Structures are given as C-alpha cells and as structure tokens.
Amino acid sequence: MAEKRNIFLVGPMGAGKSTIGRHLAQMLHLDFHDSDQEIESRTGADIAWVFDVEGEEGFRVRETQVVADLTEKQGIVLATGGGSIQSKEIRNNLSARGIVVYLETTIDKQVARTQRDKRRPLLQVDDPREVLENLAATRNPLYEEIADVIVKTDEQSAKVVANQIIEQLGF
C-alpha cells in the first residue's frame, strides 16, 4: 500500500479526522489539509453560513470541487467532511489518488464529542443522536466500501490512533 503518497481520512462527525490527521501529517512529515477548513477559506465564511445560504446541496457542490482539487496534490494527509462520502465523484477521487483510512467510532462517542459544537449544521436539531444514527446507516457502508484500512478511534488518543495508522500502512 505504501506506493500511494496521500492519506485520506474518512469517517463520521466526531471520529477525530482533523485531530488525528494533524498528528499523522506531523509524524510523516506531510502537509495536512482539512476539506471543511478549505471550504471556509475559499468562501470566507464558516460551514454553518454556507449551509444557511446555499443549503446542503450548495455546500456539497463546493465540497466536491475542494476534494477534487486537494486530492490532486501529492504527499498530503486530508481530513474529509463526514458527508463527503455520499458523492460518487469524491469516493472515486479518494480511492484513485491515495490510501483511504476509515476512522470508525460509535454513536455514543459521536454524541459526546459533538454535543457542544455549534459548527455542525446537521446536528442543530432536538435529537442529534437520531440524526447521527440515520447518517451512520447511510454512510457507514460507503466508508467501508472505499476503505483501505479501518481504525477504531473510541477509547484512544489521537496520537495513538495516528501511530496505529502508520503501523497498518507499513510506514
């Protein structure tokens, strides 16, 4: 697997993609990118604003372009948005242009990690657990479909998970 130069992290909200990605990039001396941060940088607004103004569909169009651009780079670790996996184009780009690591976590951990985060538009509802369960039912099979490696993140620090990824990839 080591012939691919990019590492792409996929998984649900609260799996630790951004935090683990930063550790992984630092440990491997690679550039780190976060697709949500790149969208915010390009629009000059936060994700919640993009959702409010353009809706989820408008956000997904932006996300598809950002992921297409970032996956063309070499020598990067990319943390993708949790919903990016729903796009066939994004799945194809991730699979073709790097190693895909699925960061798996439980609904309980997702709830605990995201409950105070107001920057997650899909969770600004009365029952975020129900939303997370519905998203998992749709998205988890897609994460599994393109994953080269699956790593559980529930009870471990970001640094430990980053080390596990490095071990599994043989770096």
UniProtKB/Swiss-Prot annotation:
It comes from the Bacteria. One of its GO terms (molecular function) is magnesium ion binding. Binds 1 Mg(2+) ion per subunit. GO terms for biological process: amino acid biosynthetic process; aromatic amino acid family biosynthetic process; chorismate biosynthetic process. PANTHER family: SHIKIMATE KINASE (PTHR21087), SHIKIMATE KINASE 1, CHLOROPLASTIC (PTHR21087:SF16). Monomer. This is Shikimate kinase.
